[in-house]
Amino acid sequence: MSRRHRFRLSVIALTAFVGAFAACSSTSAVLPADGLVPLGNWGGDSSAMIVSDTATHLHIACTYGDVSGRIAIDAAGGFDVSGSYMLHAYPITVGPSVPARFVGHLSGSTLTVTAIVNDTTQHTTVTRGPVSVTLGADAKLGPCPICRRPVITKLPAAH
């Protein structure tokens, strides 16, 4: 094999390696096939989220919010959905649940979200976050426990 031929093969191999490395280390989001935030428990620092078929429940520190159903993700991984929020949830719940928007982005198994709360009792807008939660990670909520768990219904065994 000539020296020139070996050089060409080396260049081709190097180009293939660099291309494969770049493809594997890409930061582009891989979105869920159904276009919805994946089901399960999500955890982060001072934050947690539970996603079930019927609701999404988000804790940020000692406050929490709810969205009906699962959150739909757009083609870029973003979302902006309406829900409700409880600004005073621990140690006891005080006040009504108020309207909120949840805005964020899903990248791989990490979701970043900000709650924009319309505090109708104080006539002001309150922002909680942004926080990041990761699917399957433990929540680090300190003294504020997550207050809801997804309801799993099992049918009784047939006899």
Question: Over which residues does each language-model region extend?
Answer:
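Bacterial N-terminal signal peptides that target proteins for export
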Residues: 2-14
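Surface-exposed, polar helix/loop patches in the mature regions of secreted/periplasmic/lumenal proteins
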Residues: 97-143
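C-terminal motif of bacterial Sec signal peptides marking the signal peptidase cleavage site
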Residues: 20-23
